[in-house]
Amino acid sequence: MTQPYDIVIVGGGIAGLACALSAPAGTRIAVVDKGEARAGSSPLAQGGIAAAVGPEDSVELHATDTIAAGAGICGESMVRDICGEGPDVVAWLGSLGARFDRGSDGELDLAREGGQTVARSVHTADATGFEIVRALREAGRGRAERIDSRSTALLLADGRCTGVMTEDGPVLGRGVLLATGGAGALWA
């Protein structure tokens, strides 16, 4: 392609798809992902989304639990920011069509997981990641071009990133966003 995309997103999991959806309408987006649409870590995530959405919960309690579970190694202000955004993220995903488990009363069926003093994990059985990816893909249909190819290098010119090299050739962009996950392999 000779004309660059407005943005090239490397990674087709939850982070990359959410970024694609947050771009203004009309933005030319390429999502470059190494695997087929259902591959990667995101669809395999079984747990829930911890968010203070229950009647016995609060953002402050969520942050307190998270900081305690972090055994002193988490940045407290970052924890508070992330916990504060949790309820809005759950609502946003619901507005996109994510189907989370609900009780007989129609309210979210919250699970209590490790480190939580109250039940706060929103889930879809044991396939929460798969459901979130499904909802994001559905909501983003037609918003981005998916390029199924492994990225092998960042393309640089005059001190800035201008795209990515893939196994199938270059993909140029005015901006490049890395949403590749895989941090767990850091220690492998």
PLM region descriptions:
Residues G13-I14, E36, A127, G184:
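Residue-level detector of alpha-helix initiation sites
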Residues T2-Y5, E167-G175:
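Core beta-strand elements of the Rossmann-like FAD/NAD(P) dinucleotide-binding domain
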Residues I7-V31:
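N-terminal Rossmann-like FAD-binding beta1-loop-alpha1 element of flavoenzymes
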Residues G173-G175, A179-G184:
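Glycine-/small-residue-rich beta->alpha transition segments that form the dinucleotide
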Residues K34-R160, A179:
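Conserved N-terminal/central alpha/beta ligand/cofactor-binding core
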Residues L186-A188:
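A conserved FAD-binding loop/helix module that cradles the flavin
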Residues G16, C161, P170:
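Ligand-binding pocket scaffold of soluble enzyme catalytic domains
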Residues G12, S149, R174-G175:
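Structural detector for helix-capping/boundary residues
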